[in-house]
Design a protein with these regions (language model features):
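Sec-dependent N-terminal signal peptides of Gram-positive bacterial secreted proteins and lipoproteins
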Residues: 4-30
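Extracellular adhesion/carbohydrate-binding repeat motifs centered on closely spaced tryptophans
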Residues: 22, 30-31, 258-320
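Functionally critical loop-and-helix segments that line ligand-binding/catalytic clefts
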Residues: 32-82, 208-260
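Substrate-binding cleft of extracellular glycoside hydrolase catalytic domains
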Residues: 35-181, 185-187
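Hydrophobic anchor at the start of a short beta-strand
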Residues: 120, 190-192, 213
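Glycine-rich, charge-decorated loop segments at or immediately adjacent to ligand/cofactor-binding or catalytic sites
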Residues: 133-136, 199-207
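Structural recognition of alpha->loop->beta junctions
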Residues: 142-156, 160-162, 204-226
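Aromatic-lined carbohydrate-recognition surfaces of secreted/lumenal glycan-active proteins
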Residues: 184-202
Length: 320
């Protein structure tokens, strides 16, 4: 996530968080932390903003983690994901990294979150300066997540200073985001655009991007068109993790939007998932046999040669 937030914003957020924390018992170190925005504040099931005001419509509480949280927890043997889950966290957005530059703790974070029973999504920070690179970024992401049960969205973090420094126009940036999200969606995953208020209003044409929004705005304001996740602070405290943690609230039930098992359709293509993982190769469902390509798409209404033998598939994908 973008680290160079303005000094003014950080100062205001810090003040707000101090006010909120004045009304709770200070955390007693690593194992008993209570974050400033609702993980235990005000009692079980309470969701509050930086000023302690209730936040309505929250479906799930989550966190964002990367190598930074992993390293901050190293003295305690790494992130204690079981403790994280017990604190009320139900999903984690895991940092994948940059193009051809995987976060060094991506695998550990994914495995730890999944082993504890958390839902997982990923976020990827773009450095693309053209649509071809944005497309390549999407392909890189897909190559890294194909073997994991992704039950939350795949996020494109567009807050890139490199993009602005190179003078890309709003339309050029929008085109890049569109290409990335289309590629992710075509592969059967649910894309989401991560950005703050300035980027959404000044650097992207949101009328061309009909995707979920992961809204990064610290403090109290959490509403934006298509906002499904709100990132409300990067100074939360969560049991099981050392140091600051970025806290998220989800306002939709992704369990109903992203199927865990069975067939799912993306435009004209069909995929089959088991525990959120896209299946490939031969598949038997009931008394019918199907074949799913390397990209997970069901082969249908054609004849293909597989291992030297021709196979014909009906319009519904069933083997003749």
């Amino acid at each position: 996530m973008k680290k160079n937030r303005t000094a003014i914003l950080k100062h205001l957020c810090a003040c707000a968080l101090t006010i909120a924390m004045a009304f709770v018992v200070p955390s007693a170190g690593y194992a008993a932390g209570t974050d400033t925005l609702g993980f235990g504040v005000g009692g079980p099931g309470t969701n509050v903003d930086a000023y302690g005001n209730p936040v309505s419509g929250v479906v799930a509480k989550g966190i964002t983690v990367s190598k930074y949280q992993y390293r901050a927890s190293a003295a305690n043997g790494g992130i204690d994901w079981d403790t994280v889950k017990k604190s009320g966290v139900s999903f984690a957005m895991i940092r994948l990294g940059y193009y051809n530059d995987l976060d060094p703790n991506f695998v550990e974070n994914m495995k730890g979150a999944l082993a504890a029973g958390l839902k997982t999504g990923i976020f990827f920070y773009t450095q693309a300066l053209d649509v071809d690179t944005a497309r390549a970024e999407a392909d890189f992401v897909l190559s890294q997540i194909k073997d994991y049960p992704i039950s939350y969205p795949v996020a494109y973090d567009v807050e890139s200073d490199t993009i602005l420094q190179n003078g890309l126009t709003k339309q050029q940036i929008t085109d890049q985001v569109k290409v990335f999200c289309e590629r992710i969606a075509a592969a059967g995953y649910r894309p989401i655009v991560y950005a703050n208020n300035e980027w959404l209003n000044n650097h992207l044409d949101m009328t061309q991007l009909p995707y979920d929004i992961w809204y990064a705005r610290y403090g109290t304001v959490n509403e934006y068109p298509n906002r499904t996740i709100w990132q409300c602070t990067d100074h939360g405290e969560v049991p099981g993790i050392g140091g600051n943690v970025t806290v998220e609230y989800a306002f939709v039930d992704y369990g109903t939007l992203i199927p865990s098992d069975g067939w799912k359709q993306v435009e004209n293509d069909w995929y089959y998932v088991k525990n959120y993982i896209h299946q490939t190769g031969w598949l038997t469902v009931g008394d019918k046999t199907y074949y799913l390509g390397a990209d997970g798409k069901m082969v249908h209404d054609t004849t293909v040669n597989l291992d030297g033998k021709d196979y014909t598939f009906e319009a519904d994908g069933a083997l003749q």
